[in-house]
Swiss-Prot record:
Source organism phylogeny: Bacteria, Bacillati, Bacillota, Bacilli, Bacillales
Residues binding Zn(2+): C108, C110, C135, H137
Co-factor(s): Zn(2+)
Location in the cell: Cytoplasm
Transmembrane stretches, start-end: none
Predominant location category: cytoplasm
Record-given protein name: Glutamate--tRNA ligase
One of the GO BP terms on file: glutamyl-tRNA aminoacylation
Database matches in PANTHER family: GLUTAMATE--TRNA LIGASE (PTHR43311), GLUTAMATE--TRNA LIGASE, MITOCHONDRIAL-RELATED (PTHR43311:SF2)
Keyword Metal-binding: yes
UniProt keyword terms in alphabetical order: Aminoacyl-tRNA synthetase, ATP-binding, Cytoplasm, Ligase, Metal-binding, Nucleotide-binding, Protein biosynthesis, Zinc
Species for this entry: Bacillus pumilus (strain SAFR-032)
Xref: NCBIfam families: gltX_bact
Length: 483
């Protein structure tokens, strides 16, 4: 094995880029870049029934959107291709034929029904279900008879008996498996397709992978892959298994869990920033030295240390993601925030596709008003709802504010001040509120809260004079009259 670090992300094109797969890609990418090595993307598409049209293209496009680039893949030949497993069948055949020739593998003619019966009988005896080895030493006559019955064989790897497979996991430390607990496993299906564990081991060797960094759900695959490496006398790469991502209930993140958005494309469509999502995902199961949590991609590459991958499950905290994204949104200039948010206002039918100069100025002021508190692009629709409503509804907290005894006096004074304004600007509105204070003697919350609630329906919000300006004199006076 050479000195250059070579790692891979190996997706199956079975759908869009999931947050968990994005994390696997991102950590492999950071590890390769931090070590001056190569990051390879290999498409594991042997299970044609599960492949989704457009799945491959979607995954690669959204990795690029996140800021993850690669050195070798289907679009960048580094001399170790093909990079799609479905195009490597001749390569796999050469290696499983070699195992058959050396009697390190054998043909198995058991039917699915026979295997299921065997499994059920083992469970009934409280035994660990595994293949009994029924076909492991067939005579030529027995094999000919099974072939004459029209049976199609699979190929099984002959698991060595009485051995212990040990590896030093980069995340979890030493892990060991007894081979006696692993039955002879299928490496080629009856239709001639290599299984996952066989194809992966062959590819990782031929593509000169030095480190395999993946989710802990692959731990049980590792001894099988190591046995295949050993059978050929190949160097075994270093393995590291990252902990699961869990939701707020500490349950494994499941694609069926609809309370959490789980696909990168959905975050992109909602107006999350790729740099922020990269930052957030990089902290899912990895931590830097110190308290800082916001880093550029280049900074992550400089500080990434595989030894700081967490041994505990990574909590997917939606509030944290919104906070991280908000920090990045706050760093944008107004033109960038408008580009991020305006399409969402247009899609929601709040503003038209073609804006007059006057309307464009109004929209830019509206977006600027919420710039600091915006968590993601699409949130602008919800935040600005009060500017597009004819009628506003008051919740219980708002009703309690409006029921205070000073409110009629404050509202009457404020309406009078607004009607006298010739110029409806934030400065003039601020002066009008001060005049109400002088006229009524009410100040602080007794003054500002009723005005805010009356015109916005909310007890909290952005700068009040700017909000009143954008609502417009007519709307504000109508709302005051309605209470």
């Amino acid at each position: 094995m050479g000195n250059e670090v070579r790692v891979r992300y190996a997706p199956s094109p079975t759908g869009h880029l999931h947050i968990g797969n994005a994390r696997t890609a991102l950590f492999n990418y950071l590890f390769a870049r931090s070590q001056g090595g190569k990051f390879i993307i290999r498409i594991e598409d042997t299970d044609q029934k599960r492949n989704v049209e457009g799945g491959e293209e979607s995954q690669l496009r959204h990795l690029q959107w996140l800021g993850i680039d690669w050195d070798e893949s289907i679009d960048k030949d580094g001399g170790y291709g093909p990079y799609r497993q479905s195009e490597r069948n001749d390569i796999y055949k050469k290696y499983y034929d070699e195992l058959l020739e050396k009697d390190l593998a054998y043909k198995c003619y058991c039917t699915a029904e026979e295997l299921e019966e065997e499994r059920e009988a083992q469970i009934a005896r409280s035994e660990m279900p595994r293949y009994s080895g029924k076909c492991s030493h067939l005579s030529k006559e027995e094999e000919d008879k099974l072939i004459a019955e029209g049976r199609e064989p699979s190929i099984r790897f002959r698991v060595p008996k009485g051995e212990i497979i040990k590896f030093d996991d980069m995340v979890k430390g030493e892990i060991s498996f007894e081979t006696d607990g692993i039955g002879d496993f299928v490496i080629v299906k009856k239709d001639g397709t290599p299984t996952y564990n066989f194809a992966v081991a062959v590819d990782d060797h031929l593509m000169k992978m030095t480190h395999i960094l993946r989710g802990e759900d692959h731990i049980s695959n590792t001894p099988k892959q190591i046995m295949i490496f050993n059978a050929f006398g190949w160097d075994v790469p270093l393995f590291g298994h990252m902990t699961l991502i869990v939701n707020e209930n500490r349950k494994k993140l499941s694609k069926r869990d609809e309370s959490i958005i789980q696909f990168i494309e959905q975050y992109k469509n909602l107006g999350y920033l790729p740099e922020a999502l990269f930052n957030f995902i990089a902290l899912l199961g990895w931590s830097p030295v110190g308290e800082e949590e916001l880093f550029t991609k280049e900074q992550f590459i400089d500080i990434f240390d595989v030894n700081r991958l967490s041994k505990s499950p990574a909590l997917f905290d939606m509030h944290k993601l919104k906070w991280v994204n908000n920090q990045y949104v706050k760093a944008l200039d107004l033109d960038q925030v408008v580009a991020l948010t305006l399409p969402h206002l247009q899609k929601a039918g709040k503003v038209s596709e073609q804006l007059s100069d006057e309307k464009n100025t109004w929209v830019r002021k509206l977006i600027a008003l919420y710039h600091e508190q915006l968590s993601y692009g699409a949130e602008i629709v919800e935040l600005t709802e009060l500017f597009f409503k004819e009628q506003i509804e008051y919740n219980q907290e708002a009703k309690e504010v409006l029921a205070e005894e000073q409110v009629p006096e404050v509202m009457a004074s404020f309406a009078g001040q607004l009607e006298r304004l010739e110029s409806f600007t934030p400065d003039e509105i601020k002066a009008a509120i001060k005049a109400v204070q002088k006229e009524t003697g009410h100040k602080g919350k007794k003054l500002f809260m009723p005005i805010r609630v009356a015109v916005t329906g909310q007890t909290h919000g952005p700068e009040l004079p700017q909000s009143i300006e954008l609502l417009g004199k007519e709307t504000v006076l109508n709302r005051i009259k309605q209470i």
